[in-house]
Amino acid sequence: EQGIGDIIQFSRYIYLLEKKYSANIIIKTDKKIAHLFSKSKFKLIFNEDNIPKYDFYKHLMSLPKIYYEKTKTFPSQINFIPKDKKITLKWKERLNEIKGFKVGINWQGRKTYGVDHLRSIPLNYFNDLFNIEKINFISLQKGFGLEQIKNFQHKDKLYDFSKEVDNGENIFEDTIGILQNIDLVISIDSSLVHLSSTLGIKTF
């Protein structure tokens, strides 16, 4: 129904449905993030032609409204994302070499998104943050936006691991490892902000 970020953000409601009704749940999702549901019992499909027989259906983005109408609350953070211990340890060792408070930063979204100009922030707008002492910044960019680092005033204070990150079949696998080993995330509205929040990382 929506993008990858929305799927990550609102999938918590699917887990609430499963818990309350003990239902067999079928999710049509993006194949690139199938591994994020590996701990669940959900049946995943990636093509509308392969939808099996079902009793009820609902669009993912409708679930928050239904839940709120019934409870007048929003569910607390539910971390359903599996962790790869090997990858997490790899990034723990790498990031331990960087002493002090670590902030992950994501400033540029996918340029092909229709209103990307309303969400992405030029890297140089963050200049003042880089003047704060004892703060280390970790770039969480992959692809779009990396070209801005070359002319960034504080590029010597920005750690860029983009060439080592998420080069396998499973999107976000290294990003998750990095997120679990930093203190804070500052991000535009992209899939990454929903990923870090779901993992329980303090996110702005």
Residue ranges of model-derived segments:
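Catalytic machinery of carbohydrate-active enzymes
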Residues: E1-F204
